[in-house]
């Protein structure tokens, strides 16, 4: 990992993250191109920091006042954050969130909506995917591209597809009134940039999902954004939608980072709406796959997805990180004609967009990835210890 992890305009970006400090635990930090600055004087957790009114202004003022002491060099810490180079005595970047719920919206792009239907029709069997894809596209074609979810037009299309035997639970959440919102991972369980990401060892058909992740506080205010990899098991979910939890939530199966960029005069939700994500997968055997996902093609506005995830009917007192979904659904053959894409151990996955930087992870299986051991209790113990020593 290097300075390419930072946004292209890092000199003006307001980046917050979490730093693992040996002997002390997790610190909430601000990250500049040169330094990693301690924000403990403002908040002890990322969740608490994002609760502050006018958080971007508060963080800038705190840094400008000189109260945020330097904890580490940004370049050195990025290098140490690579799991292959990490040492116990060195500080490294964790996932930037902590106590927040980690939620995700699914089936928010037409391209990935069709792939979910294909998985369902193929019953999770990758060898059947290409034949099913041709059959599904022949019936549905481009009929979904201009449909507004929940509209009268979407209701009419549903009736047509029901009559043709092509209606699907994925189309219901894709173009119906209610978005799919699910729990991607538990608070504190996400891994950061440089960490290993885990695939369930029983999966034979899986893929990365490059996504924008919004950071919202308990009031439902979206205050920043990050990058995420919603690691997905296509075969598990394809066999049954009731296996969504097993398909999505495994050890190290959720990556977020490298940082949360706070909204300010230089970066806003309108910039998020126009983000183009790039994906690069480099396999140990020389396989290369590239893809992209354009937020401008999303079928539901990002703020609408936030309002469907939290509100008067569902509160998150510690805030929420929300994956927005992806239009990327890989079909490039890797192991033979018609087999499509699946991960192998050792794949390096890079997800990037200019204003948020680059999230980089290597693939292993969830049973071999470092186990999740640093939870809420451990964090509270570390914070109490630091408080007693101050």
Feature locations, PLM:
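Beta-sheet entry/capping signal
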Residues: 28, 35, 101-102, 213, ...
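Well-ordered beta-strand positions
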Residues: 20, 29-30, 215-216, 352
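N-terminal cap/recognition module
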Residues: 26, 31-66
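Active-site microenvironments in enzyme catalytic cores
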Residues: 2-19, 58-283, 384-388
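Catalytic-pocket segment enriched in acidic/His residues
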Residues: 1-14, 22-25, 232-390
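Short, flexible beta-strand-to-coil junctions
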Residues: 19-24, 32-33, 219
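Short, surface-exposed beta-strand-loop junctions and turns on beta-sheet-rich folds
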Residues: 35-37, 43-46, 230-233, 358, ...
């Amino acid at each position: 990992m290097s300075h390419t992890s930072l946004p292209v305009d890092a000199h003006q970006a307001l980046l917050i993250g979490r730093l693992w400090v040996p002997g002390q635990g997790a610190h909430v930090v601000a990250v500049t191109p040169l330094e990693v600055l301690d924000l403990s004087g403002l908040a002890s957790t990322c969740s608490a920091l994002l609760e502050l009114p006018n958080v971007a202004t508060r963080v800038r003022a705190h840094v400008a006042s000189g109260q945020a002491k330097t904890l580490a060099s940004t370049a050195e810490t990025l290098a140490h954050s690579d799991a292959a180079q990490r040492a116990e005595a060195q500080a490294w970047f964790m996932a930037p969130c902590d106590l927040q719920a980690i939620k995700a919206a699914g089936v928010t792009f037409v391209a990935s909506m069709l792939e979910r239907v294909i998985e369902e029709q193929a019953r999770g069997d990758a060898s059947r995917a290409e034949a099913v894809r041709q059959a599904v596209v022949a019936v549905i074609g481009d009929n979904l591209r201009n449909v507004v979810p929940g509209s009268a037009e979407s209701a009419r299309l549903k009736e047509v597809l029901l009559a043709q035997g092509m209606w699907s639970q994925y189309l219901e959440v894709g173009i119906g009134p209610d978005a799919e919102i699910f729990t991607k991972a538990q608070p504190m369980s996400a891994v950061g940039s440089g960490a290993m990401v885990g695939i369930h060892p029983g999966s034979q058909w899986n893929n990365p999902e490059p996504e924008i992740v919004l950071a919202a506080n308990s009031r439902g205010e979206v205050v920043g954004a990050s990058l995420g990899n919603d690691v997905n098991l296509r075969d598990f979910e394809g066999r049954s939608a009731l296996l969504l939890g097993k398909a999505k939530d495994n050890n190290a199966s959720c990556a977020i980072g490298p940082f949360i960029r706070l909204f300010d005069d230089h970066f806003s939700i309108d910039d998020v709406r126009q983000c183009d994500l790039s994906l690069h997968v480099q396999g140990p055997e020389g396989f290369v796959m590239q893809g992209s996902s354009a937020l401008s093609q999303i079928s539901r506005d990002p703020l609408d997805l936030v309002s469907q995830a939290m509100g008067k009917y569902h509160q998150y007192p510690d805030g929420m990180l929300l994956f927005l979904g992806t239009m990327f659904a890989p079909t490039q053959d890797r192991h033979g004609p018609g087999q499509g894409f699946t991960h192998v151990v050792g794949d390096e996955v890079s997800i990037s967009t200019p204003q948020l930087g680059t999230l980089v992870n290597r693939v292993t299986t969830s049973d071999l990835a470092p186990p999740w051991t640093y939870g809420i209790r451990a964090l509270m113990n570390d914070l109490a210890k630091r408080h007693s020593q101050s």
